Amino acid sequence: MAEVYHALGSRITVVETMGRIIPGADADITRPLHKRIAARYDEVLLKTRVTGATVTENGIEVGFETGVEIRTATFDRVLVATGRRLSGDRLGAQAAGITPDARGFIPVDAQMRTTQPHIFAVGDVVGQPMLAHKAAHEGKVAAEVIAGEKAAFDPLAIPSVAYTDPEIAWAGLTETDAKAKGIAYEKGVFPWAASGRR
């Protein structure tokens, strides 16, 4: 959303609790984005958490803590984008004999079956990543299984994407995950400068 508001003329400050932006992606693909937004935005604050926000006559005063310093800044508007809160525990799945997990997700197997073998679930309610194209693929798998076909869902086959400028996308294990799991891998690199969308 910061990209959209910046394009519309807003001044932007990004606050990220992790040590880099888009922590789910490998650092080598987020570095070009970080470099670009750091030049465009007022600030990109990493390893920083918001300690509070107070409406004042001058705007919204926000407190930040980096572990080293505590400070405040005043903004016209604040957009909080910390993820999604799932409402799977409010679907009434228990009435069908399905118990959501501790985070509210409906547990499913690779065929998208719930704990009740005749009931299937797909989409955000079954877990990460919460992406429309992931849900569509899960739905296809469920339909094929219901039709008697052999099918299984593999979340690693689903691309992740950040609609930023430059756009970032990845699929499969990240390089960091492959290293951590001791999996041999090959890495391909395509320079941003060669992209027609830069």
Q: For the regions a protein language model found, what residue spans apply to each?
A:
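Glycine-rich phosphate/pyrophosphate-binding beta-alpha loops
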Residues: 124-131, 164, 192-197
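Rossmann-like dinucleotide-binding cores of NAD(P)H-dependent redox enzymes
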Residues: 1-71, 129-136, 144-177
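A structural micro-motif
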Residues: 10, 42, 60, 98, ...
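Hydrophobic/aromatic beta-strand patches that form the interior of the parallel beta-sheet core
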Residues: 13-15, 45, 79, 120-122, ...
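Structured beta-strand/loop patches that form or line metal/cofactor-binding pockets in enzymes
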Residues: 54, 169-198
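FAD-site-proximal beta/loop scaffold in flavoenzymes
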Residues: 73-146, 153
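Conserved beta-strand termini and adjacent loop/short-helix elements that scaffold enzyme active sites
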Residues: 47-49, 103, 188-190
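Short, solvent-exposed coil/turn elements at secondary-structure transition points
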Residues: 50, 56, 112, 125, ...
